[in-house]
């Protein structure tokens, strides 16, 4: 029989488990793979396989992340699980493994704990579109009313961080019991199916990069005699066609308008370039010295230049190659935002703290010396003297 070819018929989505340490995130991840393996939608991945998370590098930061995959009738999922609390923070801030939706795991025995709060806050800051809740370890709580209280507490927490806490699906179960059950029709395994039904129906389909408005960070600029100026870069999102109107944004508040008169890839002329392509765009009526690395080429009106913003930042420890000493307000490092490398000042820390230690994560206000194309949810690196000292995500634009 001919080998079956991979058909991309289902929507692909990135999800993950979040929540306090020892509340059962990894056990639940294993239980999902086991439950779906009965239906042929996954290979069962045991707990200790997931717990040995391999190291990954993102923006110079080492993060331990486990990836498993599984599918339901509706979607194909890539699921991430991190062994340590610090790994979650680093992952969410750097966007190393992006989440289109997250499963918040809360132990019925404990209720909402400090990391539960921190993960929900981070999910809000980095714009995770939707959460569902799994109240775990309900087999260890005899009084149903206690579980009701935990559910109310979780819904209140979600509301306080602007998630729709009253409508978020909350499923009660036991990941460990589901793993021990070995029966696709068992009551605990049914709870896992119930959770996956909620994930299928409640998480909205992610917007693909190619369907978003066109944006390309400018890496290099060339002048071609008789033809004009070419800017090169990797298209971050959307599609660009020959003849499209675009804007050149950043480095000043003035936005230049131009038309793409040609798109080239590997020295061949194309009709269009799309997200992920490394291309050169020929621009009408633009001189070589009017464009700089660090600006972006974008669909008109889709992004604007800004200097001042709030960001959630993870400060690297010295073992990660970061600073050995804390820094205070007024610190002026370099901010690497897409292809721009711009000096900025830390105006203030939201917590009212006076200084930040290596290994901390903190929300801060930053003011750049000149404007760059900025939007909420955008990632950046902070560097000083040639080394990365922090990684951040824009949470709010001020001006």
From Swiss-Prot:
GO terms for molecular function: GTP binding; GTPase activity; translation elongation factor activity. One of its GO terms (cellular component) is cytosol. It catalyses: GTP + H2O = GDP + phosphate + H(+). SUPFAM superfamilies: EF-Tu/eEF-1alpha/eIF2-gamma C-terminal domain, P-loop containing nucleoside triphosphate hydrolases, Translation proteins. Residues 60-64 are annotated as: G2. The keyword Oxidoreductase does not apply. Residues 10-207 form the tr-type G domain. CDD domains: EF_Tu, EFTU_II, EFTU_III. It comes from the Bacteria. PROSITE patterns: G_TR_1, G_TR_2. Disulfide bonds: none annotated. InterPro entries: EF-Tu_GTP-bd (IPR041709), EF-Tu_GTPase (IPR050055), EFTu-like_2 (IPR004161), EFTU_2 (IPR033720), G_TR_CS (IPR031157), P-loop_NTPase (IPR027417), Small_GTP-bd (IPR005225), T_Tr_GTP-bd_dom (IPR000795). GTP binds at residues 19-26, 81-85, 136-139. Residues 174-176 are annotated as: G5. This is Elongation factor Tu. It comes from Petrotoga mobilis (strain DSM 10674 / SJ95). The gene is tuf.
